[in-house]
Amino acid sequence: MNISNKTRYGLRSVVYLGINYEKENISIKEISDKEGISKRYLEQIFAELKKGGIINSTKGTKGGYFLTTKPSEITVSGIIKLLEGNLNVIQEIDDYNIEDLEYTIVNKVWNKMSQALIDAVDSITIEDIINDYNSLSRNMFYI
């Protein structure tokens, strides 16, 4: 399974909004500049995140984007599912016979891999990522 740039950038943007959760609204331009992501591409991603209820926006001079819920309540899996569609490691197969070898492999291998992936990203919140990032930032030494 390959995670698309859309999802990678979407997750980075949501984490950025999470870092600034209790501050002012954040403009797409700011995220674009700080994260090196095309403003146009971010606008497309933000439209999907907004439609999915992860973010919202306000207009005006102090306008911008913000998270609709606390970073501790947003899971990585929620963002991936919203932007990717699903977390299956292979495309779903509808037409195989229960007696086929493929059926056994799908159930023994691919479905278990998919479930392990889902379990992993279900357990990670945006707040977890922010805490790890802040911990790494505090431990950096500059010469």
Regions flagged by a language model, labelled:
Residues 30-35:
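A short alpha-helical element within helix-turn-helix/winged-helix DNA-binding domains
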Residues 10-22:
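Short amphipathic alpha-helical interface segments
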Residues 54-62, 66-67:
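Beta-hairpin "wing" of winged helix-turn-helix
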Residues 24-29:
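Short acidic, hydrophobic short linear motifs in intrinsically disordered regions
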